[in-house]
Amino acid sequence: MNVINCEEVKRDEFHTEKYYESYNIFGAHVVTEDEIQGVRFTVWAPHAKAMSVVGDFNEWDYEQHKMLQVTEEGIWSLFIPHIEEGEIYKYAIETLAGDVILKADPYAVYAEVRPNTASVVFDIKGYEWNDKNWNRKKKKKSIYKEAMTVYELHFGSWKKKEDGTLYSYREMVEELIPYVVEHQFTHIEIMPLVEHPYDRSWGYQGTGYYAATSRFGTPHDLMHFVDECHKYGIGVILDWVPGHFCKDAHGLYLFDGTPTYEYKDKDVQENPVWGTVNFDLGKREVRNFLISNALFWMRYFHIDGFRVDAVANMLYWNKEGQEQSNEHAVSFLRELNEAVFAEDEDFLMTAEDSTAWPLVTTPTYEGGLGFNYKWNMGWMNDVLKYMECAPEYRKHIHEKMTFSLLYAYSENFILPLSHDEVVHGKKSLLNKMPGDYWDKFAQLRLLYGYFFTHPGKKLLFMGGEFGQFDEWKDLEDLDWNLHDFEMHRYMHDYFKELIALYKRSKPLWQLDHSPEGFQWIDANNNEQSIFSFIRQGDKQEDALVIVCNFTKATYENYKVGVPDFEYYNEILNSDAQQYGGSGQVNKKRLKTILEPYHNQAAHVEITIPPFGVSILRPVKTRKGSKKQDGSKTKVRSNVTSRGKR
């Protein structure tokens, strides 16, 4: 880290210009000045009357190490000789009211383990990375035309030691990475790892944005974990929260006794949804703090993506009775995305946004917000409501399963089955399914089959892969003992086979963001709650036919219109006995019948399993086969594109 001497910095650069290396100025840096080794402390506190650095090295005496104000706008700095890495410290701030308050360093890269709240001097330089091969391979691929399977997890509750203590960053290399590799996830998405005082905030209410939480080890330990993920071909996405922060006394809240990082106006300062306060995104120093922070995680931790939390809460003011857009936030998000993609054009910037705000994943130079992915919250809500409905009544809400295809190409979407849907009394995915024990597992297999064949990249929260029965318990770990039960083992086997099939099947991801990649065969069979569609890859022969039955009925000799290939093989059936199903499968090769059906040139007759998904792959095309109008067979989209990519 190239530390900048504050006296040499232009006064206005941090306060009035885009300055995205503010971590080089602020914080505690181990340096040598005038041939004396020590630590340079620098902080921004615009309304402080006086500032001191306090810690064990001066017995927390406010009078010993007074800081010098180096800009009129409130940058304070001090070099303290002969103190070293590992010292704990805080800033003692004399407010305009004459009080002295103690604050952790906003730019500290390390902190004490909670419940202690002091910052820790840590030299973040020196980690030797070994991920050049990962970076080289990443640049050769288009994230839009590749398979993407994201495993979302909470670091502290995925797995715990027998005594209930947490695994460290380094220990999780041995525990988590082999598991992720076995399941063929392409990425992990970790809930926030910034320093936070309250375990049950899950990291979303942070105090130390530059400090990887010390619950699990040092910053270098986390770097090692990321490095090892890259070694095994796993991308690392972090949850990141630039909208709001917690009100704990030692944190950013009223940092110098006045609103510093938050809005002054109480109407927009307070965030009643979470009991937090909102960042003042119109203030240049705050923007520099946050955008520098994003780049800091990219540069020093080699992170591959951010899932930007609560974008909807940023885009609109939370004034009671009003829904007015926050132009500060809109401008900030555009500036953020421009800075991130200038740093790494292959980075993943995903918006967690539940609104209908347009052009979220459109580049800023085309008038968009500039993200490259967005969670499809509408799909998630509609599909889960449909699945929770009793099967005999699903025909009355049939449109919940088809509506997503009206807007599927308006943005670059990730389909999230996330932590938000399996907590706070919402039940686990398995327990959302109606019916008896067998029905629940059959319908979860069906849901996953639909999930992996619907356009959009994939995200699943931990535990879903083996059918966690209880909803997520953040103070415990996953119910790993469920593997002792046969149906959970079947579910786990099914999930691993499904994700493997997804990854090796280009039609399921190659044209995720193009209407040419999807065609309904029959979207209107609400009476039987059966949906059939085609997923298409770049090549004509790269096509799959998918049939989903959302009732418990079994249908023999069911006609499905298909493109004119000579034969089809069933390559996956969720009702197979090895997955815990009843065994209503199509074992034999399916010969195409040259009679038009479902607006297709031909059809096959198959067995439709109860609560089942069947995936068919063409085997051989007829030479010169033609449709009724004389044109050659080609899969055409019948869904709506809204002009995005």
Curated annotation (Swiss-Prot):
The enzyme's E.C. designation: 2.4.1.18
Entry keyword annotation includes Transferase: yes
Enzyme class: transferase
Reaction(s) the record says it catalyses: Transfers a segment of a (1->4)-alpha-D-glucan chain to a primary hydroxy group in a similar glucan chain
Swiss-Prot/TrEMBL keywords: Carbohydrate metabolism, Glycogen biosynthesis, Glycogen metabolism, Glycosyltransferase, Transferase
Family matches, as CDD domains: AmyAc_Glg_BE, E_set_GBE_prok_N
Region feature Disordered, mapped onto this chain: 619-645
Keyword Repeat on entry: no
Recorded metabolic or biological pathway in which this protein acts: Glycan biosynthesis; glycogen biosynthesis
Alphabetized InterPro entries for the sequence: A-amylase/branching_C, Branching_enzy, GlgB, GlgB_N_E_set_prok, Glyco_hydro_13_cat_dom, Glyco_hydro_13_N, Glyco_hydro_b, Glycoside_hydrolase_SF
GO CC annotations on file: cytoplasm; cytosol
Gene Ontology annotations of biological process type: glycogen biosynthetic process
Function in brief: Catalyzes the formation of the alpha-1,6-glucosidic linkages in glycogen by scission of a 1,4-alpha-linked oligosaccharide from growing alpha-1,4-glucan chains and the subsequent attachment of the oligosaccharide to the alpha-1,6 position.
HAMAP family according to UniProt: GlgB
This protein's name: 1,4-alpha-glucan branching enzyme GlgB
Source organism: Bacillus cereus (strain ATCC 14579 / DSM 31 / CCUG 7414 / JCM 2152 / NBRC 15305 / NCIMB 9373 / NCTC 2599 / NRRL B-3711)
